[in-house]
Amino acid sequence: MRALIVDDSRFVRSFLRGLLEQRGVECEEAGDGQAALDRIHSSAPFDLALVDWNMPVMNGLEMVERIRAEGYRDIKVLMVTTEAEDDYIVRSLNAGADEYLMKPFDDAALGDKLAMMGVEIAAS
């Protein structure tokens, strides 16, 4: 299992990486949506992307729209953000995200969302 963690916060990227690597997931990171697209285009395929909404250069919503438009349908996308309004959730899902997780969260909440998405990883 390979995951791409996309967030402009180094702390959040490190936190998510720690949670996922404990579960045996190989992780790469990007600090904005454009950097994430560059990684998707130049790396081995990713199974999962955890994507923040608000980022510089290219936000998470635009990134998800782009990867879906480019045919990357096999990447499961979990939006991980502080945006709580229903409009953000609906727009994320309409753009092609598979699920939505509110910050702050813990390991159990992340595991539950991944299970809902059909992502099979080891228990922490």
Regions found by a protein language model. Give the residues of each.
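Charged docking surfaces used in two-component/phosphorelay signaling
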Residues: 14-22
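Acidic, metal-coordinating helix/loop segments flanking the phosphotransfer/catalytic sites
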Residues: 29-48
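Receiver (REC) domain active-site loop signature in two-component systems and cognate sites
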Residues: 55
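C-terminal output helix
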Residues: 105-114
